[in-house]
């Protein structure tokens, strides 16, 4: 079976990936949010969001071969709700297609535009993961220059929760010297929990040369620290520069402890850490789909 635009999710064929079986679907190539830390730019370049050619037609063809109750995620690397989505509505039209099939939907986004589609999401077994790396709008503007500010993302979390659509938050990535203050992290978890988040996914920044250069240029006072931690002291895993295991545990533990204290499920993403850092049925938040009013399926970590 050869699929066209719906692809089995298999990041780098990595043993560190703990996601359940799912498919990824990207209505757009590139991403207009232009986050400095983006890993996808290392292989697709830094390009604005562009609708894929004949995308809906290709999705329709692929859906003929997708098994019942499959999880389809939009999107793992290119945000499904870039600014252009308000006009072209490609993601919305995709949801309308998915609504005609027995599939489950996981949406990962930084955009409040997702709330526009609440009417459709209430009809599909679905869950939403919204990325919030900081509560500071000015810091977010620096590291995620064209993404909606955290204040709008928090508003979206509240609106989704009030509409009974399960929502979680990705505190990802955590970057040394940028957004790693444990007190601010604890505050972030508390605020998103109050807004309605039920699950937290977290991960440390995995460096590529292009993203490392962007961060160093934007925040020159941390350039030396990043180079020391990633280039000199770090470890290479699947072509990415990782922090040492001890450093990753140090940065992620405040997230995990605060989430557990507040009664949230929590997991890390592609970190290879022990079970203390994985306190959830799934890492990606797909288990939240079982809480959707339209879902009768329980998702277990495989």
Over which residues does each language-model region extend?
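Auxiliary Fe-S-binding modules of radical SAM enzymes
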Residues: 2, 183-302
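Surface-exposed amphipathic alpha-helices with a cationic face
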Residues: 95-99, 122, 157-164, 256-260
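Charged helix-capping and loop-helix junction motifs
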Residues: 88-90, 151, 182-188
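Active-site glycine- and acidic-residue-rich loops that bind
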Residues: 107, 175-188
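Hydrophobic faces of well-ordered beta-strands that scaffold small-molecule active sites
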Residues: 70-72, 105-107, 128-130, 167-171, ...
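Conserved strand-turn element in the central/C-terminal portion of the radical SAM core barrel
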Residues: 146, 159-181, 238-243
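Conserved Radical SAM active-site core
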Residues: 1-129, 133-138
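Conserved radical SAM core fold
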Residues: 73-82, 113-115, 128-147, 174-176, ...
